[in-house]
């Protein structure tokens, strides 16, 4: 089964009109999970990630579902998601990437994954990648007609107003935005043919530390990322994420700019217990070991929590004082007019809940 890179999307600021491109656009919900190209050839099933790495061993229940529900020989494009109550849960999904097969099996039983499909690349001996998306979509729907269970076809609309309503509402079910697809486009692996609209918000956060960049040297230290915090109701400064993606010049400047704030052993830094397992369990601190970090050096340079920055983010993962930024935040500017103590979770926009079953229920 040769590797296939999925077709990608480029970001746009708002939901484009249906006639924005020649041939027209249709819209789909943007699912927040693991992108997957799934191959089936009889009993042989392979699940490949966006970067073509194998995900098969991490989703045994998905392999069984593909054998039961997908055509005998096919290649499909979709998203693997995990449902927790009435919304998607990316944290639970991420836990699947674990070296222990016993742990993967347990998670598959407790939190079974779903496969949401949105494209059909091949069926039997027929390559569909040169056909327009409208035809591929029609073939996908026909191939899964009557299928019920953990494999489904994403819903679609050609109505811009409906897409805008989805964008506003579906975030409450854990979705990520809206994708617009040209009806006449062929399948372009690794090509940014589609358009995506994601939520964009800002927050004022406390900068309480930084990590050095991987190219940093003792003679020329370079900042890699800023460690960001928000105050919980009980007064604890919770680590909510990082801001990165600075130019090399800016990395050097930030080292000098933040030097006066570097904490000393006499300072009572709110994250001084970051290496303590009990402290990690009781509150959100930077540096917790996980399946993603492995043996990576997670140490950081602590800063007195005296400066506030405005950052851009898409959405929060988790509820209340345990929330964190789902992706790396974007540094926008310093907010020296703000007091660090004013940087609380209360400033964040609350997203109204939406019933995920409604999103999954229509193909």
Residues covered by each model-derived region:
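Catalytic cores of nucleic-acid ligases and guanylyltransferases
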Residues: 1-363
């Amino acid at each position: 089964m040769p590797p296939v890179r999925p077709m990608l999307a480029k970001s746009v600021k708002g939901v484009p009109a249906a006639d924005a491109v020649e041939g027209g656009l249709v819209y789909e919900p943007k699912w927040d999970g693991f992108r997957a190209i799934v191959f089936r050839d009889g009993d042989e099933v392979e699940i490949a990630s966006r970067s073509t790495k194998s995900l098969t061993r991490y989703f045994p229940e998905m392999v069984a579902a593909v054998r039961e529900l997908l055509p005998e020989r096919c290649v499909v494009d979709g998203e693997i998601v995990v449902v927790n109550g009435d919304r998607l849960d990316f944290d639970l999904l991420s836990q699947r990437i674990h070296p222990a097969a016993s742990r993967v099996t347990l998670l598959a039983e407790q939190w079974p994954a779903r496969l949401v499909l949105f494209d059909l690349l091949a069926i039997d001996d027929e390559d569909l990648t040169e056909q327009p998306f409208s035809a591929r979509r029609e073939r996908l729907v026909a191939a899964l007609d009557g299928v019920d269970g953990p494999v489904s076809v994403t819903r679609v609309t050609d109505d811009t107003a409906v897409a805008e309503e989805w964008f506003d509402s579906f975030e409450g079910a854990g979705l990520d935005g809206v994708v617009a697809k040209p009806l006449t486009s062929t399948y372009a692996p690794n090509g940014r043919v589609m358009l995506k609209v994601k939520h964009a918000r800002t927050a004022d956060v406390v900068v309480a530390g930084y990590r050095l960049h991987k190219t940093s040297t003792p003679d020329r230290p370079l900042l890699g990322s800023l460690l960001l915090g928000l105050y919980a109701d009980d007064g604890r400064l919770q680590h909510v994420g990082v801001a990165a993606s600075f130019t090399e010049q800016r990395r050097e400047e930030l080292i000098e700019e933040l030097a006066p704030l570097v904490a000393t052993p006499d300072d009572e830094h709110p994250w001084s217990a970051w290496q303590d397992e009990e402290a990690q369990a009781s509150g959100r601190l930077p540096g917790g070991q996980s399946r993603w970090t492995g043996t990576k050096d997670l140490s950081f340079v602590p800063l007195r929590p005296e400066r506030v920055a405005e950052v851009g983010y898409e959405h929060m993962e988790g509820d209340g004082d345990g929330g964190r930024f789902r992706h790396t935040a974007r540094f926008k500017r310093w907010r020296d007019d703000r007091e660090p103590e004013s940087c609380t979770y209360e400033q964040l926009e609350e997203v109204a809940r939406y019933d995920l079953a409604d999103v999954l229920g229509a193909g």
